[in-house]
Regions:
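N-terminal Rossmann-like NAD(P) cofactor-binding subdomain of oxidoreductases
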Residues: 2-258, 292-296, 320, 342, ...
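Short secondary-structure junctions and interdomain/linker hinges
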Residues: 77, 126, 262, 277-281, ...
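Alpha-helix boundary/capping residues
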Residues: 135, 273, 277, 333-336, ...
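A structural signal for well-ordered alpha-helical scaffolds and beta->alpha junctions
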Residues: 144, 213, 263-267, 326
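Oxyanion-binding "anion nests"
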Residues: 262-315
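C-terminal active-site/capping subdomain that shapes the small-molecule cofactor and substrate pocket
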Residues: 298-303, 308-419
Length: 419
């Protein structure tokens, strides 16, 4: 038995095809029809890092999108000039979208994407923010910029899955089911840029493990007020390490109790996401990092031999006394409704609450709401803090490209993206 406020059927992925490379690419090309333009605006989008794991996921999500049209694909120099189907080692369980298969891969330079209205970045962190990786010209003067910043400076709207700008004080770090209001800082980001930008900005989505954590925490803070303390232990899927990822001899028959930088990301990102935006004396906007009600987060992160789906065991302490009961927590989680109405890729139900004692499980629950929702189970009293429970989220969907896609949809609906 599960509860989402209404009956929900867990969606399974579309039919699979064999995971072959470019030699058999023609058999991996999707022939599915697009939505008509009557479904919404026709917005040209580009994908950076299109041959990588996150880039491939972006293309799967964009293939039949009612608003966004795949217009440009960028990748590393070894792929530039090739048709996408011949450049990519396709690793998704659905075919290569037919819209992308014959597109010629472009070099990741802003001038090659200038006719796009939105750019999705699936670049690895070491490229997304590495000085000297990308070049472009203004008034014939060569400039060396951080890669994603170069696209912003070219007045392009960038939605990034990389970590590089998450700590920037003017860049929103958005989990769309949690803090879409943080898009309000974008005009300030544009105004502070030199020259001032009309259309360009950067929005980042959170680390995959942070995303699964903050959605239930947001639901609980909305229902019961501030949370004071969070203890979280993660069991993270190997797909979170990208491809080819963790060597098989390291992960088979094993658990690796360390993921570099992961714990620090969870502890810091949670504060920025769940915090608000305040105004300083000079009228500028600042992320308050949950300072009005200090929140402490302690994370322990582990890599486990699961392909997709991050599991997290969480204990929380509320500021309110007495704290809510386990039943009140279950009801609040099931009733949670995020501010994503009108977004085509947003889940109808953000959280499913399981009553069975052995749920959620990655194999059974990672495709809830097509991977865009979060599963919660084992809600019970905690003898050290107040309440403890288990979270399961799909790290390659809501934990990565799906979040970035919904962020872009929100930006369109709120008029942040100029179309």
């Amino acid at each position: 038995m599960t509860s989402t406020g209404s009956t929900t059927t867990t969606k399974r992925p579309l039919s699979s095809s064999s995971r072959t490379g470019a030699d058999n690419a023609s058999s991996l090309i999707s022939k599915s029809p697009r939505h008509t333009m009557q479904d919404g605006p026709s917005i040209k989008v580009g994908v950076l890092g299109a041959t990588g794991t996150v880039g491939q996921r972006f293309l799967v999500l964009l293939a039949d999108h009612p608003w966004f049209v795949i217009h440009a694909l960028g990748a590393s120099p070894r792929s530039v000039g090739k048709p996408y189907a011949k450049a990519v080692q396709w690793k998704q369980t659905t075919p290569i979208p037919h819209q992308a298969a014959d597109m010629i891969v472009r070099e990741c330079k802003p001038e090659n994407f200038i006719d796009c209205q939105i750019v999705f970045s699936g670049l690895d962190a070491d490229v997304a923010g590495d000085i000297g990786k990308f070049y472009y010209r203004i008034l014939d003067q060569p400039l060396i910029l951080l890669a994603e910043a170069a696209f912003r400076s070219a007045d392009l709207a960038v939605f990034s899955n990389a970590k590089n700008y998450r700590r920037d004080p003017h860049v929103p770090l958005i989990v769309p089911l949690v803090n879409p209001s943080h898009l309000s800082i974008i005009p300030q980001q544009q105004a502070l840029h030199r020259p001032t930008l009309k259309k360009g900005f950067i929005v980042t989505n959170a680390n995959c493990s942070t995303t699964g954590l903050v959605i239930p925490l947001c639901a609980l803070e909305k229902a019961f007020g501030p949370i004071e303390s969070v203890l979280v232990t993660t069991m993270q899927a190997i797909s979170g390490a990208g491809y080819p990822g963790v060597p098989s001899l390291d992960i088979l028959d094993n658990i690796v109790p360390h993921i570099g930088g992961e714990e620090e990301k969870m502890e810091w990102e949670t504060l920025k996401i769940l915090g608000g935006i305040t105004e300083s004396d000079d009228g500028s906007k600042l992320f308050d990092m949950h300072a009005k009600h200090p929140l402490r987060v302690s994370a322990s992160c582990n890599r486990v031999p699961v392909i997709d789906g991050h599991t997290e065991c969480v204990s929380v302490r509320f500021a309110r006394r007495p704290p809510p009961s386990p039943q009140q927590v279950r009801e609040a989680l099931a009733a949670f409704t995020p501010d994503t109405q009108g977004c085509p890729s947003a889940p109808r139900h953000a959280i499913v609450v399981h009553e069975q004692p052995d749920r959620p499980q990655p194999r059974l629950d990672r495709y809830f709401q097509n991977g865009a929702g979060v599963s919660v189970g084992r809600v019970r009293q905690c003898q050290v803090l107040d309440i403890k429970f288990v979270i399961l989220s799909n790290n390659v969907s809501i934990g990565a490209a799906t979040s970035s896609l919904i962020n872009a949809e929100l930006a369109v609906l709120k008029g942040v993206v100029v179309v």
